[in-house]
């Protein structure tokens, strides 16, 4: 156990790791934040403002803030709208113009969630970022790999294929080992 020193007094308090959780206000990210808090992480909720067509992003941010308040965790909104347009929307449009079939989810994960969000969170003192993705992280031979989620019907590991090992060492996927039905049960039992 890691020990911390405070005013020259030794304590047996485990060093708490800080995780910034990307929160949409939906079931999966809300339960992810709850599970990480239950595991002893210092959880910070973050809503990524990426696309605010017809005010939908504002509603998601309100919902995420309500959940963060219920969990008693700090909450931030990171405005990434211009970067999202530049790195995801423009990429998608350019790909279509060039006769390609883009996957905006893959690009959003690479550039926004596990690019800009991860970098910003780390610069603010986070040890990890987490999301409500259904995927598993497995360490084998000292290397990190993405594996299919336990719930094959919800698996999102395909959308994360661009993440290199240096990023995988800084991310958590708390829902990777559980079924969606269990996630819903957790949500209703916690009244989030």
Where are these regions (language model features)?
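ATP-dependent adenylation/nucleotidyltransferase module used to activate substrates
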Residues: 1-161, 172, 181-183, 188
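His/Asp/Glu-rich metal-coordinating catalytic cores
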Residues: 164-167
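Adenine nucleotide phosphate-binding catalytic loops in nucleotide-utilizing enzymes
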Residues: 176-177
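Short, intrinsically disordered, charge-balanced linker/junction segments flanking boundaries
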Residues: 190-192
């Amino acid at each position: 156990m890691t020990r911390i020193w405070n005013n020259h007094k030794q304590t047996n308090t485990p060093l708490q790791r800080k995780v910034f959780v990307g929160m949409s206000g939906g079931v999966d990210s809300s339960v992810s934040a709850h599970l990480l808090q239950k595991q002893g992480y210092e959880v910070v909720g973050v809503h990524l403002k990426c696309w605010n067509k017809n005010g939908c992003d504002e509603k998601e941010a309100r919902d995420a803030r309500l959940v963060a308040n219920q969990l008693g965790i700090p909450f931030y909104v990171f405005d990434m709208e211009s970067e999202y347009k530049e790195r995801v929307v423009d990429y998608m449009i350019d790909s279509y113009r060039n006769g390609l079939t883009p996957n905006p989810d893959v690009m959003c994960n690479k550039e926004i969630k596990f690019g800009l969000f991860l970098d910003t969170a780390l610069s603010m003192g986070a040890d990890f970022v987490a999301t409500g993705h259904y995927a598993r992280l497995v360490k084998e031979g000292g290397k990190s790999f993405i594996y299919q989620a336990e719930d094959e019907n919800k698996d999102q590991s395909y959308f994360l294929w661009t993440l290199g090992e240096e990023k995988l060492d800084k991310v958590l996927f708390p829902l990777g080992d559980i079924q969606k039905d269990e996630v819903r049960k957790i949500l209703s039992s916690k009244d989030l």
